[in-house]
Amino acid sequence: MEKYLIKMPIKSKANAVPEEKAVVKKGTPKMTGKVTKKDTPKELKDKENAGEDNTPKQTKGRPGRPAVKRKNLDNPDAKAEKKATEEENPPKRRSSRLTRSTRSMAEDGSPSPEKEKPEKLPFIKYKGAIKYYTENQDIAASADDVLQWVEKQKDEVVPMAFDMEWPFSFQTGPGKSAVIQICVDEKCCYIYQLTNLKKLPAVLVALINHPKVRLHGVNIKNDFRKLARDFPEVSAEPLIEKCVDLGLWCNEVCETGGRWSLERLTNFIAKKAMDKSKKVRMSKWHVIPLDENQLMYAAIDVYIGQVIYRELERREKAKIKNEAEFKENNGEAAFKAMKTLGETFLTKINEVTL
């Protein structure tokens, strides 16, 4: 026996302890604790079926908030509570009353005057001559012809429609004044393209500053300021002092208010529509030559300006005459009382008897 005991290798206790520690390291107490605390999938399923799982479930919305169960409306108590709440605070219901628009659509007959659709106005058709010049000497010769025509007129005041065009870019802003258009007679419009001009011809400057010439347009003062910035030989102040803004004049004669555009003024006074195409309005006015659409656009602007001036002039004369007759028949006090009504004088002047 001793023989066999001597030959067989026997492990010492010192060697056995590290092996036990190594086994313990493979399964640490933390790992074993987690495993023991976790429930198996089968146990979790059993708890869920038994109603023991109180862990809040994640829902869409704010994380970590438990889902709120809706009230069971089949319950008689819940129905009674809902009915009592509605009686105390009745829900807002859409009114069955017809609105102005639906009522006017439902009723037979014409709509109310304030809701009537605006009348479709016919577009302006200009059939007169268009004289278009691009070179300095041609512009000077044309301006001289117009100047001589003005001096031959017997009237003390010669109205002249005036307008300007220039290119515009959203990146660089407005360009230099490129076109001047004028009209002294509804049968002919003059268009002067300034692209090749470093300086305006002296005769053109003399024409627009002539004492008999009354320049007119819509927002015309800003045109003169721009022209003076682009061409220093033009002084803006004398032109501004003697010009006529058609929008302001319309407010005085027709007793209207607000600011006017040429398009709206054309609708109101001339009962015509303008084709204010953005493609033409924002086109390259400095490029020579202008095409037919540009020429017609520029000519119509001053042509209709001359038409509006003549119509406002006629209305002003009629208004002055009617006011004088009213004062003569009813007295100054009645005239002042009439003016305080705030209505358009010409439409009410014959309806009041004092």
From Swiss-Prot:
Swiss-Prot/TrEMBL keywords: Exonuclease, Hydrolase, Magnesium, Metal-binding, Nuclease, Nucleus, Phosphoprotein
Gene3D superfamilies: Ribonuclease H-like superfamily/Ribonuclease H (3.30.420.10)
Composition-biased stretches (Basic residues): 59-70
Modified residues (Phosphoserine): 104, 110, 112
Region (Disordered) residue spans: 1-120
GO biological process, one term: nucleobase-containing compound metabolic process
Record has Transport as a keyword: no
Domain 3'-5' exonuclease as annotated: residue spans: 146-314
Disulfide feature: none
Compartment list: Nucleus
GO molecular function: 3'-5' exonuclease activity; metal ion binding; nucleic acid binding
EC number(s) given by UniProt: 3.1.11.-
Compositionally biased tracts (Basic and acidic residues): 36-50, 71-91
GO cellular component, one term: nucleus
Family of this protein: Belongs to the WRNexo family.
Role according to the record: Has exonuclease activity on both single-stranded and duplex templates bearing overhangs, but not blunt ended duplex DNA, and cleaves in a 3'-5' direction. Essential for the formation of DNA replication focal centers. Has an important role in maintaining genome stability.
Protein name, as recorded: 3'-5' exonuclease
Gene source species: Drosophila yakuba
Lineage of the organism: Eukaryota, Metazoa, Ecdysozoa, Arthropoda, Hexapoda
